């Protein structure tokens, strides 16, 4: 099997799209769609319990700073093992949820989060394949920035137990990647 193959896995979710303010009937300002990608967390050195809200993630807030409106066009979590994962495998649990969900990363482990999934990274069987888990945009509010603040924007939960033989450097990581539509530029000082 080719170890460079990407495994794409959909998450089960409840279709409950967020509502947004209605747009005025006047001419809209131009919009630009930009890509983004950042490392959300790493695994393999200790127990990891991460909650990453896209609305407040530093790389996203920097990207959206000069605009009044920001809306997710597409987004995915990318689980990437390193070569160290082959000899030191680990299990990662993850789920996309609305930011106002009371779910925690450790609850995915106990299968208490609908759509939560577990992935084995590394080892002899799964080797070092990259796994993509797309965000279902029909289960969260796409608007990250608007005239009001929304509480049901996307949040990624990720958990991994402390490894039996912890590595000094991470054996895997999660990147969040996607595209975001930015509109209505603000006047800002240089």
UniProtKB/Swiss-Prot annotation:
Record's subcellular location: Virion
Keyword Transmembrane helix found: no
UniProt modified residues of type N-acetylmethionine: 1
Main localization (coarse): virion
One GO cellular component term: T=3 icosahedral viral capsid
One Pfam family, short name: Tymo_coat
Acetylation listed as a keyword: yes
Keywords annotated in UniProt: Acetylation, Capsid protein, T=3 icosahedral capsid protein, Virion
InterPro entries attached to this UniProt entry: Tymo_coat, Viral_coat
Molecular function terms from GO: structural molecule activity
Superkingdom assignment: Viruses
Main function: Self-assembles to form a T=3 icosahedral capsid composed of 180 copies of the capsid protein. The capsid encapsulates the single-stranded RNA genome.
Protein family (similarity comment): Belongs to the tymoviruses capsid protein family.
Protein's UniProt name: Capsid protein
């Amino acid at each position: 099997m080719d170890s460079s193959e990407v495994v794409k896995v959909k998450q089960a979710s409840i279709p409950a799209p967020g509502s947004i303010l209605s747009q005025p009937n006047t001419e809209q300002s131009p919009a630009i769609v930009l890509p983004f990608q950042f490392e959300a967390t790493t695994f393999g050195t200790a127990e990891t319990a991460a909650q990453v809200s896209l609305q407040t993630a530093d790389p996203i807030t920097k990207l959206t700073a000069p605009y009044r409106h920001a809306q997710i066009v597409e987004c995915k979590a990318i689980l990437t093992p390193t070569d160290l994962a082959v000899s030191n495998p680990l299990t990662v649990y993850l789920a996309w949820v609305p930011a106002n969900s009371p779910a925690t990363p450790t609850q995915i482990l106990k299968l208490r989060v609908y759509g939560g999934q577990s992935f084995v990274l590394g080892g002899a069987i799964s080797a070092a394949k990259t796994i993509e888990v797309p965000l279902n945009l029909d289960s969260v509010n796409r608007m990250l920035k608007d005239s009001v603040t929304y509480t049901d924007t996307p949040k990624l939960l990720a958990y991994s137990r402390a490894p039996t033989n912890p590595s000094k450097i991470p054996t895997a990581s999660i990147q969040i990647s996607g595209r975001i539509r930015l509109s209505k530029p603000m006047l800002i000082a240089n």
